[in-house]
């Protein structure tokens, strides 16, 4: 049997079947993502081999290409098979012998307990160099690496309905961010307020001075102050939108199935930017204090936004859904009765007379992890999902899903950080079974067992967090020490020391 499998795999390789084309990089003509001294980006861990010789070459190649793990894990083919084992659920981390991640970042992940065929989480950790695109003064110049900026980048992407969107975002989102920052290189390095407009040709008057424009001067007596920080936030928001648009364009040609939640951290010029679209979360643990750096975006947390859209555009609901929320599904026998409800403007509840339209399925239903939009999806922000439709219907769900992240900023220069101060990023596989306080307790317990200058301490912490959420196999399932069910989802965790590269790298 083994020989037949080997023969089949050899036949597939020799048949010359090519994997689907890779999505285009937004960074043409220059696609490098690191300074000249940095090593070029390596290919991702090799895809898993096909397990059957009966599949056609095209299908087998597609199956192999559909599973990959982050490059920095440096997995061998055998390690890749162990990472894909639902029974053992071995925790994966970068090898001790390999090059450390930037900032001595810790990382660990584990596959789900059978929820999906492969691990649909993806991760990325990069040092990205940004070349300026133009001079703010309007004088064209050639890009110079000496005048650029570097930013540190971490990303967790929790895929659903397939891993294609998460894999694509993990390879390209940081490049979209870099592209958006190119116009800001000189502006961010200049302490003066940002110009209102960027000149397009030499000699164009500075648009921050409106004296060259016609009209009453009184209308220019006041101008909003825009901070450098808000420019970076806007660049990140635009990058998320452009990434989502690229997925829409290329989803068929590149097998970008499903969608993904995206949690991204950027360190630039002394500040940490945390951008979240989905139900992954990030917290800072600083001297025992817990500082939330993101929040979940679910049908419950965004109920009013969803209901408002359904109210303003009822055609998106068809004749199947109502934008109103009721404590439970309305029954036909309750027509004419007064029942509790709430609409897009309400945080409380009131009574209304039940009408025929109220018998439709509610746009937002369920609660907690069972809350759904249009009875289909449990997250309301993320990337992808352009082909997602209501079951047995042609109604698209994408209009209700936002690709824009919420961005929170943390100024590292405002505090004196010790080696035990960390930023913890985790997909929902961690947070579904672990509270913020439990994470903080694990941070204290694990880091206290290591010397402050031991670079492996943050990887050990990431592993402990993943193991704590996964549990141990017992009673036909994965159980926590309190005998509650462990997380059966994919779990991915970054631990970023807030001391930065100068102290710990």
Curated annotation (Swiss-Prot):
Cross-referenced InterPro entries: PP2C, PPM-type-like_dom_sf, PPM-type_phosphatase-like_dom
Residue ranges occupied by any PPM-type phosphatase domain in the UniProt entry: 104-498
Source species, domain of life: Eukaryota
Any single GO CC term annotated in Swiss-Prot or TrEMBL for this entry: mitochondrion
UniProt modified residues of type Phosphoserine: 66, 76
EC annotation from Swiss-Prot or TrEMBL: 3.1.3.16
GO process annotations (BP): signal transduction
Disulphide bonds in the chain: none
Listed name of the protein: Protein phosphatase 1J
Highest classification ranks of the organism: Eukaryota, Metazoa, Chordata, Craniata, Vertebrata
Gene designation per UniProt: PPM1J
């Amino acid at each position: 049997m083994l020989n037949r499998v080997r023969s089949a795999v050899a036949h597939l390789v020799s048949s010359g079947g090519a994997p689907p084309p890779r999505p285009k990089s937004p960074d043409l003509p220059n696609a490098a993502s690191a300074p000249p001294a940095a090593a070029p980006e390596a290919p991702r861990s090799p895809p898993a081999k096909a397990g059957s010789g009966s599949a056609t070459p095209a299908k087998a190649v597609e199956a192999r290409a559909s599973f990959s793990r982050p490059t920095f894990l440096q997995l061998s083919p055998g390690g890749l098979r162990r990472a894909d084992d639902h029974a053992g659920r071995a925790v994966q981390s970068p090898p001790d012998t390999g090059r450390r991640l930037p900032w001595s970042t810790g990382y660990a992940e584990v596959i789900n307990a059978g929820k999906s065929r492969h691990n649909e989480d993806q991760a990325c950790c990069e040092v990205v160099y940004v070349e300026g695109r133009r001079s703010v003064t309007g004088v064209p110049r050639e890009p110079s690496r000496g005048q650029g900026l570097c930013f540190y980048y971490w990303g967790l992407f929790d895929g659903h309905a397939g891993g294609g969107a998460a894999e694509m975002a993990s390879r390209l989102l940081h490049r979209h961010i870099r592209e958006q920052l190119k116009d800001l290189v000189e502006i961010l390095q200049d302490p003066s307020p940002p110009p209102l407009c960027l000149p397009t040709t030499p000699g164009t008057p500075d648009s921050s001075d409106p004296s060259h424009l016609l009209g009453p001067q009184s209308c220019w007596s006041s101008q909003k102050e825009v901070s450098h920080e808000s420019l970076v936030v806007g660049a990140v928001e635009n990058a998320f939108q452009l990434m989502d648009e690229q997925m829409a364009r290329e989803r068929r040609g590149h097998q970008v199935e499903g969608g993904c939640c995206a949690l991204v951290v950027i360190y630039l010029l002394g500040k940490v930017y945390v951008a979240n679209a989905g139900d992954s979360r990030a917290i800072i643990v600083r001297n025992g204090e817990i500082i939330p750096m993101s929040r979940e975006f679910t049908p419950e947390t965004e109920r009013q936004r969803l209901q408002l859209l359904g109210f303003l555009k009822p055609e998106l609901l068809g004749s199947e859904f109502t934008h109103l929320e009721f404590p439970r599904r309305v029954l036909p026998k309750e027509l004419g009765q007064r029942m509790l409800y709430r609409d897009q403007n309400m945080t409380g509840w009131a009574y209304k007379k039940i009408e025929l339209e109220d018998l439709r399925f509610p746009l937002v239903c369920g609660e907690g992890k069972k809350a759904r939009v249009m009875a289909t999806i449990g997250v309301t922000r993320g990337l992808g999902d352009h082909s997602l439709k209501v079951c047995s219907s042609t109604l698209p769900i994408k209009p209700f899903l936002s690709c824009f992240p919420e961005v929170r900023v943390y100024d590292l220069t405002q505090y004196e950080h010790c080696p035990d101060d960390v930023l913890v990023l985790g997909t929902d596989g961690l947070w579904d079974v672990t509270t913020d306080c439990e994470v903080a307790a694990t941070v204290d317990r694990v880091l206290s067992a290591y010397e402050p200058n031991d670079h492996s301490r943050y990887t050990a912490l990431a592993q402990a967090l993943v193991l704590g959420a996964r549990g141990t196999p017992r009673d036909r399932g994965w159980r926590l020490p309190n005998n509650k069910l462990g997380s059966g989802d994919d779990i991915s965790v970054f631990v970023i020391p807030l001391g930065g590269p100068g102290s710990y790298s």
